[in-house]
Amino acid sequence: MGNAIREKTIHGIAASSGIAIAKAYRLETPDLAAEKRAVADVEAEVARFEAAVAKAKEELEAIKQHALEKLGEDKAAIFAAHLLVLDDPELLNPIKEKIQTERVNAEYSLDETASFFISMFEAMDNEYMKERAADIRDVTKRVLAHLLGVTISNPSLISEEVVIIAEDLTPSDTAQLNRQYVKGFATDIGGRTSHSAIMARSLEIPAVVGTKTVTAEVKNGDIVIVDGLDGQVIINPSPELLAQYEQKRARYEAQKAEWAKLVHEATVTADGIHVELAANIGTPDDVKGALANGAEGIGLYRTEFLYMGRSELPTEDEQFVAYKTVLEQMNGKPVVVRTLDIGGDKELPYLQLPKEMNPFLGFRAIRLCLEMQDMFRTQLRALLRASVYGNLKIMFPMIATLDEFRQAKAILLEEKEALLRQGVAVADGIEVGMMVEIPAAAVMADQFAKEVDFFSIGTNDLIQYTMAADRMNERVAYLYQPYNPAILRLISHVIDAAHREGKWVGMCGEMAGDPIAIPILLALGLDEFSMSATSILPARAQLKQLAKEEAARIKETVLSLGTAEEVVSFVKRTFSLA
């Protein structure tokens, strides 16, 4: 190759499917070094700080509005949270006090105070608090830039086709990406559940994150391939490799076009058995994407987004409107609503809950709702009032004991009877089920099945709790094994127990849309697969090629294997999966 630019491949995490090929555009982080200096007029310095905060708020309001229009309500909620940071006296007051008592400049005071909070939150073994650290970092950069008179790069101004290369993309960066020009991105840090990855999937922009070194390897103008299918970034590919990737991209686009033909079809296996494919959603805005991707129902409506990014609890009427909107848009298709699942990795500052040593095993979800019954009853009333507008099913999260389920259902029935006495219409025969995400509930599924109308298996938590491994902790992430036979045996036990009582079983964890899991779950008898909207059509195409009777023959073998690796190898071999 002589002195030609050398091709290089970097590996990362496939965060958003697709293949992007374009020139590199490095999104540089400006120098926001905050040097310490003494100030004579502390009140003027406080005023300068407040002016910078006001300007940052204006920018965030504009970005929030842009996100609302382009990405939907739950993505815009990120910026509502940023605005709350800029109104938080626990952050702002110490900054002002530091300026006044130490007579130092606003930049230094902001940087020191924010760094303290960021370090504190990042040290917590809690993904939600780590995300709050990211929020504070993003907001701090914006205010610092105004104080220093530095311009923060604005991705919305990009006017040619590019692949963005960055250490990380802040939520505000990602919300400003223009799909017309930004064909993909690659970052040094991040994971599949980071803000930037979630937004990339919403925008359907190919992305590879967590490469560690992409910013060190890529220069502006380099030709870059972002392979969001296999988690690779290829820098300055050879003409031969470029041609191969053009073909790979064309095949992927052709495959997507084939999947699109299945939008209005029911999901029927090769031997004529109907399986329901549903979508997981967070807000009413997500219904449009679910229907566009052929969802036969909503298998999980996460209601906590209604409670987040605000300073007080949502009212009964606010919730009623949200639930009614979803039910009406789904036009009679089933909508499974999970009652409030707050705590653990999702906190509400206005509830002022005490900090816990281990929040994932603590006061959260149904445990919190059964104690804070006024809040719980408000949500249940809103759901019951909305029930007449569609096909509502209600499920309770984090159930560990029969007593918890009975207590939650009793409260639901009390609220239903109270509404009926007031002359408020409530639908008949609303199915009431529960999440199976605690091993105790899975083991006792035969007893629960006598009392519930359905189960929804939440594999994300069920795997964590069964394997005693936090999937966000890189050092033990190897133990997060969806295909571990222990997990598969629990799932099989739950499905068999439900079917013996004539009840149906869904799954709403990430596993439900995994191509390797799909034949296993079909073999185990799963009735409903609920997944992110963009996974529905590929799953439908796969299920149409599978015969349930044939898949059922692998059940005994799969459950008899000893390791996750053996399971994956066997399934790939049996069903010719890559």
Curated annotation (Swiss-Prot):
The keyword Ribosomal protein does not apply. It is found in: Cytoplasm. One of its GO terms (molecular function) is kinase activity. One of its GO terms (cellular component) is cytoplasm. It catalyses: L-histidyl-[protein] + phosphoenolpyruvate = N(pros)-phospho-L-histidyl-[protein] + pyruvate. It holds the Pfam family PEP-utilizers. InterPro entries: PEP-util_enz_mobile_dom, PEP-utilizing_PTS_enzyme, PEP_util_AS, PEP_util_C, PEP_util_CS, Phosphohistidine_dom_sf, PTS_EI, PTS_EI-like. Its EC number is 2.7.3.9. Keywords: Cytoplasm, Kinase, Magnesium, Metal-binding, Phosphotransferase system, Sugar transport, Transferase, Transport. General (non sugar-specific) component of the phosphoenolpyruvate-dependent sugar phosphotransferase system (sugar PTS). This major carbohydrate active-transport system catalyzes the phosphorylation of incoming sugar substrates concomitantly with their translocation across the cell membrane. Enzyme I transfers the phosphoryl group from phosphoenolpyruvate (PEP) to the phosphoryl carrier protein (HPr). PANTHER family: PHOSPHOENOLPYRUVATE-PROTEIN PHOSPHOTRANSFERASE. The N-terminal domain contains the HPr binding site, the central domain the pyrophosphate/phosphate carrier histidine, and the C-terminal domain the pyruvate binding site. The reaction takes place in three steps, mediated by a phosphocarrier histidine residue located on the surface of the central domain. The two first partial reactions are catalyzed at an active site located on the N-terminal domain, and the third partial reaction is catalyzed at an active site located on the C-terminal domain. For catalytic turnover, the central domain swivels from the concave surface of the N-terminal domain to that of the C-terminal domain. This is Phosphoenolpyruvate-protein phosphotransferase.
